[in-house]
Amino acid sequence: LKATEGLRLDAFFVMPSCVPSTGLDESGAVLGPEDIKPYYENPRVLGLAEVMNSVGVVAGQEDLMGKLTEAGRRGKVIDGHAPFLRGNELNAYVCSGVWSDHECSDAEEALEKLGRGQWIMIREGTAARNLEALMPLFEAPYYERCMLVTDDKHPGDLISMGHIDYIIRRAVSLGADPIRAIKMGTFNAARYFGLKDRGAVMPGLRADLAVLEDLKDIRVAAVYKDGVLTAKEGVCLGAGKEKKRNYAAGEEPRSGSREDTESAEKTAGGLETAFPRVFDSFHMDEVALEDLVLEQKGAMERVIQFKPHELLTEERLVPWQNTPGLAPGVSLEQDIVKAAVFERHLHTGHKGLGFVGGYGLKKGAVATSVAHDSHNLIVVGTNDRDMVLAANAVRKNRGGLAVAAEGQVIGELALPIGGVMSRLSVEEVEEQLQALKVLTRQLGISSDIDAFMTLAFVSLPVIPKLRINTYGVIDVDRQKQVPPSF
């Protein structure tokens, strides 16, 4: 909150509602109702973030109900997260005070939730792309209670494609009325969050304006904040060095300058002194080969099957695989690789092992500490040796991404701030991220799969069907641990 004061944009927040996400997740902290309550006194805290433990809400879990009751009592917005929740369970969820949902993957589900009085956030991000399936919501009367969101989006996508402006462009290209699409990306969102002083061009509202070249390409020519020209032709104006952002311009992102790097390092050095815990969030032993031993318990193995452009997974049951030179259970022919998640906040030594399918990896390993929502260390690979190397590279960097193959680390991106953020400029991060993506393609990962964003969601036990975290493989619908081999 303090870091976003005095910027040339207004930053608002909603408080995390589920830390950890469910009882079958392991985070670095636990936030209860009393931990959240004081922040509501800040006018820039608008409400409660996505209530993802829908099973707990429907069951009337005490701590969750306490958070919902407090937010509701204060008239705060309560965001939802309830994929596939229908019927009486949806009724119970809505009765608990949840206002919205951003997890709809088809129009039928969205229309049922609209019919229960919820708002629908139409999501189009890097990994989850639901816009095309939800285009019927751009028709009257549905569009009046819908808005546009990205959920997670890689920095490179923000630079090259844009943010909400990209979703508007994409919707218009799919046949949406441009005025409706713009309204869903501006006024509707402001109305939902209770920001009555902005969101439209009219007397009495704040002069926060985006000037477009036309209503077809939705290209932003200029931006005004509080009536003052703040950006023009992709260049941020005003105090400090002017910095061009090539979002939505179709240009290749440039790498950051030496001055950018030195400035970032100087700033991060001061922050590291002020907030040592944020820069020292990795508390785990080195990963060893014996940590990856997954014993065969039966003739079958359970695979977490990825779906292109979706966060949803499927359960796939196949005979146990044995291929010389690969980890037990792994099969390149069947597109099955091993997955492991290691707790890294509190030095518990907890881990979960399993298998994922549809990732496309043909050799080597990929590791990341960007793993929603607890952000433990996750690694997938075809063999244990490369998995150990990739995992330990992330640990050594105190967070980040790493790729290993044929016995060596071939690429890495350090994210030492909480294990999820970089000291570098967005251009430098994107340059390194693209280099890593090239490596993952060389290792076989399909262009239909975002190698890192896909892994970032595979450990979140609130999106069906299967996930993997430090508890092991989780059946989300049943909120139950299930064996990877049986």
Which residue stretches match the model-derived regions?
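Short beta-strand/turn micro-motifs composed of small residues
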Residues: 15, 82, 343
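Active-site microenvironment of metallo-dependent hydrolases
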Residues: 159-175, 179-486
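Divalent-metal coordination cores built from histidine and acidic residues
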Residues: 1-75, 141, 410-413
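Alpha-helix boundary recognition
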Residues: 5, 40-41, 72, 94, ...
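Active-site core of metal-dependent hydrolases
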Residues: 46-185, 190-200, 209, 213-214, ...
